[in-house]
A protein has these predicted regions:
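Expand to "…catalyze enediolate/carbanion chemistry for C-C bond making/breaking, isomerization
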Residues: 1-275
Length: 275
């Protein structure tokens, strides 16, 4: 049970000590095979150069997780190498080619600087994930609740993801007891364009969902915008206004995005306007 989360991340990397890697690999394999998760499943594998990655792939890929998370991704070449390895395993196990997607974890200065080439390196890329803790260590700066030290990285990751047509996932807020801080951090991430945000605690999931889900007011306004577009088309009008404000193409685009998100989350039905 993911407690309302859209996905659960099963970790084979930082959360597992070297002597426990084999046992963790078996546990994750069995969890994917037997537990029947009600949400998407992501497995953070060990780095390509760790000497552990191939074993991870051999155990995990046949179980068909939604995505693999590659830690400390710094180049498109790493993604292409991973793509080739996963493709071989999919073929050998009779799986559809491309079934398993990738979420590169950008947690170094080099990874952030190469964000677009990484995002565009494979059709398997589901989205980019920013790792704030390791990034600040690499930048030799202190990680703070306010997060100003990762502003540049956040903006660059979002821009790269959008340019490549993939999603952008924000770093977790690490103080599990500061609900107000989580709320502000999540709202700020959403304002930058992030699709969603990771959580290290189940208690953060409802707050994150509330921030990243469209509100009823946002849904109602988006529906009004698209209804106004439909009405203007019927009347042959080019200029469109709503509540005294001109409706231009970016507003229409955001309205459609809002309703698409609401549909995915089951907040509204499948019928839209303004197509």
């Amino acid at each position: 049970d993911a407690l309302g989360a859209d996905a659960v991340i099963l970790d084979l990397e930082d959360a597992v000590s070297p002597q426990e890697k084999d046992a963790a690999r078996i546990l994750v394999r069995n969890a994917l095979s037997l537990m029947g998760f009600s949400c998407q499943t992501v497995v953070r594998i060990n780095a390509l150069d760790s000497g552990l990655c191939q074993q991870d792939l051999e155990e995990i890929v046949p179980q068909g997780p939604t995505a693999l998370m590659l830690p400390k991704t710094t180049s498109a070449q790493q993604i292409q190498q991973l793509d080739a390895a996963v493709s071989r395993l999919e073929q050998s196990h009779g799986m559809p080619l491309g079934k398993v997607q990738f979420i590169p974890l950008l947690e170094t200065a080099l990874g952030v600087e190469n964000a677009f080439s990484i995002a565009a390196a494979s059709s398997r890329i589901l989205g980019l994930f920013l790792g704030g803790e390791d990034l600040t260590a690499d930048l030799r700066c202190k990680r703070t609740k306010e997060g100003k030290e990762i502003d540049y990285a956040r903006q660059r990751v979002v821009c790269a993801a959008r340019a490549a047509g993939v999603e952008a996932f924000d770093t977790p807020f690490t103080d599990v007891n500061d609900d107000g801080g989580l709320w502000e951090d999540a709202r700020y991430a959403k304002s930058l364009g992030f699709t969603g945000k990771a959580s290290i605690s189940p208690r953060h999931v409802p707050g994150i969902n509330a921030v990243f889900s469209p509100t009823q007011a946002e849904i109602a306004y988006a529906q009004e915008v698209l209804a106004a577009i439909d009405e203007a088309k019927r009347q042959g009008r080019g200029a469109i206004s709503l509540h005294g404000k001109m409706i231009d193409a970016p507003i229409v685009t955001r309205a459609r995005q809002t309703l698409a998100s609401a549909q995915i989350l089951g907040l509204i039905g499948g019928e839209t306007h303004g197509n």
